[in-house]
């Protein structure tokens, strides 16, 4: 029964393909069961889905072939076996057609995807070319110009600060010198006050001495007046006595002459009194002259001390005013320096923020450029993979078309033999293509691009 089924299948397939008539086989063989044909179909489909090389169609292989029962008798073929083969062939063709439609649909989807990716690739290539052809960005120039301006301002601020510090040091030195002069003037003032106090003691002593001398002069004058009074009383007494004696002389001529004695005594007393008065006046005049000279000297010293003290006071006042002015100038300069430091620190902070923002923008641009390059590289890899898949499908389709358009006359030359899985695997060739693409970039710009392709047949 199996022999009749195989014979009818082959005859039906032959008649369906070439019309009536019986084919002539150089070798008559029959298939044992339907399982052999189905196994051959599944094996062929496996080869189409796995291999990139076209399967050999010169022989019709089966993994399992039943024992061939040959009937050699007057070139007679069992048409029932041909009908069974025809049905199997139709089923196989239907399955292959469905698979081809599925492959065509997948191939069409891949083609659409490839077109879309090629369009995206062209867009990215145009974008990259536009970015490459565009004038170099001025961000770096603006950044350098801004940095130069900031450095110039920092140098200017540094110079101003150094100048202000030099002026401050000079003012501090002047202030120290003025303080030293003030200390010296204060010391001179204290010395003058000490001298003035000493002179005041001398003046007080001189005043006391003058008062004492005045008192002594008064006492001497009183004594002189008292002596004059006593002398006058004595003179009056002597005159009275002289008159009485003169009367007695007139009365008594024999008595000695007392007039000459009285004159001598009067002359002596007058000489003594005149001498005492002259000596007292001379002593008084000398003392008064000495006291006047001492008082004059003391007055001159006091007047000179007062004048020097007034000069020192004026100098102290002028120095105090100058110190106050210098303190005000120093305070204003310190305030200006603090204001300048705060201003320049704020400006420096703003410039640092601007620099950080520009650096962040540059990093973002570099990251974006690197991301575009990675996307471009990924798209290139996808495109190469799709190109390889398209080439594989193209080869599969070409192999399938060559298998379909094979002349049916070779069907008579088919030799049905058992093929082991090891032999089938040896006829399946897989081609592996490895492409290594090297892109060198620097700061987001493509410097060089190189690609290497290696093919290996597995």
From Swiss-Prot:
Chain positions covered by the region annotation Linker 2: 276-283
UniProt subcellular location: Cytoplasm, Myofibril, Sarcomere, Z line; Cytoplasm; Cell membrane, Sarcolemma
Annotated region (Coil 1A), positions in chain: 97-129
Short name of any one Pfam family annotated for the protein: Filament
Start and end residues of each stretch annotated as Linker 12: 241-256
Region (Coil 2B): 284-400
Region of interest: Coil 1B: 140-240
Subunit structure: Homomer.
PANTHER family listed in its UniProt record: DESMIN (PTHR45652:SF2), GLIAL FIBRILLARY ACIDIC PROTEIN (PTHR45652)
Function: Muscle-specific type III intermediate filament essential for proper muscular structure and function. Plays a crucial role in maintaining the structure of sarcomeres, inter-connecting the Z-disks and forming the myofibrils, linking them not only to the sarcolemmal cytoskeleton, but also to the nucleus and mitochondria, thus providing strength for the muscle fiber during activity. In adult striated muscle they form a fibrous network connecting myofibrils to each other and to the plasma membrane from the periphery of the Z-line structures.
Record-given protein name: Desmin
């Amino acid at each position: 029964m199996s022999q009749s089924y195989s014979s009818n299948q082959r005859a039906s397939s032959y008649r369906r393909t070439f019309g009536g008539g019986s084919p002539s086989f150089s070798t008559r063989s029959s298939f044992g069961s339907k399982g052999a044909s189905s196994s051959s179909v599944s094996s062929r489909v496996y080869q189409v889905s796995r291999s990139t090389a076209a399967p050999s169609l010169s022989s019709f292989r089966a993994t399992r072939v039943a024992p061939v029962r040959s009937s050699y008798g007057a070139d007679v073929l069992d048409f029932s076996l041909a009908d069974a083969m025809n049905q199997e062939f139709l089923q196989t063709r239907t399955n292959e057609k469905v698979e081809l439609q599925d492959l065509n649909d997948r191939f069409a989807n891949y083609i659409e995807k490839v077109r879309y990716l090629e369009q995206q690739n062209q867009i990215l290539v145009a974008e990259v070319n536009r970015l490459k052809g565009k004038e170099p960005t001025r961000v770096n120039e603006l950044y350098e110009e801004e940095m130069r301006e900031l450095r110039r301002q920092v140098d200017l601020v540094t110079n101003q600060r150094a100048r202000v510090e030099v002026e401050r040091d000079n003012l501090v030195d002047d202030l120290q010198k003025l303080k030293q002069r003030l200390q010296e003037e204060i010391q001179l003032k204290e010395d003058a006050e000490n001298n003035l106090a000493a002179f005041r003691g001398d003046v007080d002593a001189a005043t006391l001495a003058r008062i004492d001398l005045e008192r002594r002069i008064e006492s001497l004058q009183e004594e002189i007046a008292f002596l004059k009074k006593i002398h006058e009383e004595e003179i009056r007494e002597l005159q009275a006595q002289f008159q009485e004696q003169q009367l007695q002389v007139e009365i008594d001529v024999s008595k000695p002459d007392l007039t000459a004695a009285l004159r001598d005594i009067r002359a002596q007393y007058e000489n003594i009194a005149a001498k005492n008065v002259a000596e007292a006046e001379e002593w008084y005049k000398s003392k008064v002259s000495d006291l006047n000279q001492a008082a004059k000297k003391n007055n001159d010293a006091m007047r000179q001390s007062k004048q020097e003290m007034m000069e020192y006071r004026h100098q102290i006042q002028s120095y105090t005013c100058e110190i106050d002015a210098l303190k005000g100038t120093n305070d204003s300069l310190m305030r200006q320096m603090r204001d300048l430091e705060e201003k320049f620190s704020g400006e420096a902070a703003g410039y640092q923020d601007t620099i950080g923002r520009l650096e962040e923008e540059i990093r973002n641009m570099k990251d974006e450029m690197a991301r575009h390059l990675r996307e471009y590289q990924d798209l290139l890899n996808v495109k190469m993979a799709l190109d390889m898949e398209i080439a594989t499908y193209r080869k599969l389709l070409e192999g399938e078309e060559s298998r379909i358009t094979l002349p049916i006359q070779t069907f008579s030359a088919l030799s049905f033999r058992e093929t082991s899985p090891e032999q089938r695997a040896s006829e399946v060739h897989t081609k592996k293509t490895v492409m290594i693409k090297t892109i060198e970039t620097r700061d987001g710009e493509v410097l060089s691009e190189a690609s290497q392709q290696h093919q290996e047949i597995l």
